[in-house]
């Protein structure tokens, strides 16, 4: 089978690690322990962020290109601009030094994003599109407020990745288990962002924008029957709205495909936190999810690297 494109991975370049270690308030690193505002301290495996080792792992999984993004749950984008900008600059400079196997999602601060700088990033073939935290897109009005950066991505012909953002500590009891933010908080964010896109008429606002929601949009599409039951208007499947496979397996993804069809599903592993999906629903569906659909999402501008080229 042809080499796959994984549209959702994470890797921390050295400069970003240094910036996180220099901070004294969340998000910050002490040695390899990550501290964020809303989640328990997390022991980071440094080998998971070794670029050459990652390339080898991806090749073993048949992945020829990995699209990496700044970990939005860190909350970097939502920091005051003076704090957000250095972290985001470190991210962009760091990914520019990665092997050709990696492409990157650009990021911008929530406050006063540099639109000209974003245009320049999206004109660089190393960047496949723009990532926005779902926490920035929770309501119809939030999508409208994000219009300036969304319009830049649309004009560039590049997609937008909607990724879970930080989970606020203020909304959690102290005794919730460690898995709570990822299982409850992240999925709630994605569900809100999915339905906010539909409620605002996202396709009307951005006729040519391609959008991909991480983690199957928190399974929001599966609630389409409830949406109609409660007064929502049924809509045809939008061929330019995608969901990735991260965090779910055959049972959940089967339900999503029954609503959106196979063409909406793209390979996104969330590596290093999970492995790329190797097979789903037979050979033809697997090829669509791992090869054809990701290329369509990315505008066919990314062709998976041959192994000898990608290293």
Language-model segments: which ranges?
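Mid-domain alpha/beta scaffold segments of enzyme catalytic cores
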Residues: 1-5, 9-136, 144
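Mid-to-C-terminal alpha-helical segments outside catalytic/metal-binding sites
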Residues: 2-7, 13-65, 93, 209, ...
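Short beta-strand segments
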Residues: 6, 67-69, 107, 213-215, ...
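Divalent metal-coordination and catalytic microenvironments
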Residues: 8, 58, 95, 130, ...
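Short aromatic-enriched loop/helix-cap "lid" or pocket-rim segments at secondary-structure transitions
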Residues: 15-20, 79, 117-118, 172-175, ...
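Flexible, glycine- and charge-enriched loops at secondary-structure boundaries
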Residues: 44, 81-88, 184, 188, ...
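Short glycine-enriched loops at secondary-structure junctions
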Residues: 110-111, 164-169, 272-273
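Catalytic pocket-lining loop regions of alpha/beta-barrel enzymes
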Residues: 124-260, 264-266, 309
């Amino acid at each position: 089978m042809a080499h796959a494109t994984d549209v959702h991975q994470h890797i921390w370049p050295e400069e970003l690690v240094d910036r996180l270690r220099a901070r004294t308030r969340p998000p910050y690193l002490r040695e390899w322990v990550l501290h964020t505002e809303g989640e328990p301290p997390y022991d980071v495996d440094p080998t998971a962020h070794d670029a050459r080792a990652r390339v080898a792992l991806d090749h073993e999984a048949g992945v020829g290109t990995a699209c990496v993004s700044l970990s939005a749950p860190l909350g970097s984008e939502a920091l005051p601009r003076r704090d957000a900008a250095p972290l985001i600059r470190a991210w962009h400079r760091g990914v520019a030094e990665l092997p050709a196997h990696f492409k990157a999602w650009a990021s911008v601060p929530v406050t006063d994003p540099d639109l000209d700088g974003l245009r320049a990033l999206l004109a660089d073939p190393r960047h496949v599109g723009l990532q926005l935290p779902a926490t920035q897109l929770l309501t119809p009005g939030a999508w409208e407020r994000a219009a300036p950066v969304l319009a830049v991505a649309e004009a560039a012909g590049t997609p937008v990745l909607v990724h879970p953002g930080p989970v606020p500590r203020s909304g959690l009891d102290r005794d919730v288990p460690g898995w709570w933010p990822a299982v409850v908080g992240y999925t709630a964010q994605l569900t809100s962002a999915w339905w906010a896109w539909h409620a605002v008429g996202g396709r009307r606002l951005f006729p040519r924008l391609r959008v991909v929601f991480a983690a199957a949009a928190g399974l929001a599409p599966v609630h389409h029957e409830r949406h109609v039951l409660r007064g929502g208007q049924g809509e045809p499947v939008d061929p330019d709205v995608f969901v990735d496979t991260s965090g779910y397996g055959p049972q959940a993804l089967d339900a999503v495909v029954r609503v959106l069809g196979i063409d909406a599903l793209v390979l996104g592993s969330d590596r290093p936190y999970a492995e790329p999906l190797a097979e789903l629903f037979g050979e033809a569906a697997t090829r669509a999810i791992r090869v054809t659909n990701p290329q369509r999402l990315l505008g066919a501008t990314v062709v998976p690297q041959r192994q000898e080229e990608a290293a």
